[in-house]
Amino acid sequence: MRVIIAGSRSMTDAEQVAAAIACSGFAITEVISGGARGVDTLGEAWAHMHRIPVRRFPADWQRYGKRAGFRRNEAMAYVADALIAVWDGSSPGTRHMIATARQRGLRLFVWQPRQAPDHHRRGR
């Protein structure tokens, strides 16, 4: 399963990202990443540790300006089967990624680190 691992840039806790991945239940065969600091790069590191291929979609800020992150999210959602979002509840980029994944019909797992595991949301 091709899975986007994305989330808040302020997240620096690799254990939280690994927990989100484990709790998602997704059988990941490829990690799709936007390459941003925080969750994206922690997800890439997890993939490398587990010998899972990573496909990066860096935002083209020079070409698209403020819309670059949103365009990247849309491109990732086009090739993915699912999204694991580790979200602080306020990041607009992660909010957009979640909305885009829902719109495209991807399987969805949202992990909010301050919540207990039974409060994590699964959706389609």
Regions found by a protein language model. Give the residues of each.
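Acidic/glycine-enriched connector segments
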Residues: 2-3, 9-122
